[in-house]
Amino acid sequence: VEQGLKKLAKRGNSPIVGVGFSQANALSAAAQAYPEAQFTLIDMVVPEANVQSVVFRAQEGSFLVGALAAMKSESDTIGFIGGMDIPLISVFGCGYEQGAKHINPSINVVHSFVGSTGAAFANPSKGSEIARSQFESGADIIFAAAGSSGNGVIQAAADMGKLAIGVDSNQNYLQPGTVLTSMVKRVGEAAYQSYAAAQNGTWKAGFVSMGLAEGGVDWALDEHNRA
């Protein structure tokens, strides 16, 4: 990835856009090697003088899906499963609970976490196990912010006739009829805005925050969950 980014910079491309934690180190190295180039990193922060770091206010999108969960729940108990109990993930759970309680102040929101290391985001079987426990305890909808561990949550919901909420990208298609909706980060919109800013001369390095007002987060409605 680093060599690819450096090649783009050497050819004069600008801005050069990367996405996520996995590209952060490579983009940082490329930005240091080509200080005259403009780089944009989406969904992660790199403190280089020529990097624009775009982060999403996930709590705002999570508030929306929490409200939807409260409207749909028949048991008045819903669940949240995060990968790790860290601030990056806690904002999803907090926004989700606030949205749910905005609709139903007495709703019960159960919070669980898959693990305490990065592996927690890549353990679908553990995600499924925790989801089954939450469902058996009375939850009828679970929102997972746990990487691929969330796939296990969605599978458990399908197996048990319950509902799940996807995260980051539109996961409605994974189990149509089981995925109530997905809290999406609109990475494409973030990239478009970065390119547009460069085109009209308003691109700036530093920190950019995108929430509902900027079109950065949303909930997914499509043919898989419209009914």
Predicted regions mapped to residue ranges:
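A residue-level marker of the well-folded mature domains of exported/periplasmic proteins
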Residues: V1-A227
